[in-house]
C-alpha cells in the first residue's frame, strides 16, 4: 500500500545524505522510482529517486517491501505522541513549526515483503501492529 509523507525537513541538497545516517538509510531503501508530488492537489508522479527526494511528498516504502511504519498526527505537540503513549522511541520524528503537527516513523528490524510472495501471516501481523500503534499515537488512520 502506498504511504506518502512530507519531506520538507529532509533533503535540501544531496550533501545531507553524508551528514545523517537516517537520511542515507531512507534514500537507500527508497524505490528506484517512487511516487512523489510537489502538491497533492495535482496528483502523484513517478520520478527517479534523486528527483523524488526533493519533493515535499514521497512514497516512503517500496511497492512490495515495507521498511517503515509512518504515522501522521494532526494535533499540537504531536512529535511527543510516542512518549505520551508510552511507546518505544521512533526511528525519527518531524514536526511542522506552524502548528505542531508531526510525522513519526518506526523502522522495521527486517523489511517485510508485501507482495503475493510474502507471508500472509506476517503481513497480517504487521498490519495489526501498525493499526495498534496508530491508535495509541492518535494518528490519522487514513494516512
Question: What residue spans do the PLM features occupy?
Answer:
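Flexible helix-coil linker/hinge segments at domain or subdomain boundaries
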Residues: 127-143
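Signature for HUH/AEP ssDNA processing cores
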Residues: 1-102, 108-124
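Short C-terminal domain-edge/linker segments immediately following a structured domain
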Residues: 99-105, 134-139
Amino acid at each position: 500500500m502506498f504511504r506518502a509523507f512530507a519531506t520538507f525537513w529532509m533533503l535540501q541538497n544531496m550533501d545531507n545524505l553524508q551528514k545523517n545516517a537516517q537520511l542515507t538509510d531512507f534514500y537507500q531503501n527508497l524505490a528506484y522510482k517512487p511516487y512523489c508530488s510537489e502538491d497533492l492537489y495535482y496528483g502523484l508522479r513517478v520520478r527517479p529517486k534523486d528527483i523524488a527526494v526533493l519533493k515535499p511528498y514521497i512514497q516512503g516504502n517500496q511497492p512490495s517491501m515495507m521498511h517503515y511504519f509512518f504515522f501522521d498526527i494532526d494535533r499540537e505537540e504531536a512529535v511527543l505522541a510516542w512518549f505520551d503513549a508510552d511507546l518505544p522511541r521512533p526511528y525519527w520524528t518531524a514536526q511542522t513549526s506552524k502548528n505542531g503537527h508531526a510525522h513519526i516513523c518506526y523502522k522495521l528490524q527486517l523489511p517485510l515483503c508485501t507482495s503475493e510472495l510474502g507471508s500472509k501471516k506476517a503481513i497480517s501481523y504487521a498490519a495489526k501492529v501498525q493499526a495498534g500503534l496508530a491508535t495509541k499515537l492518535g494518528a490519522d488512520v487514513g494516512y
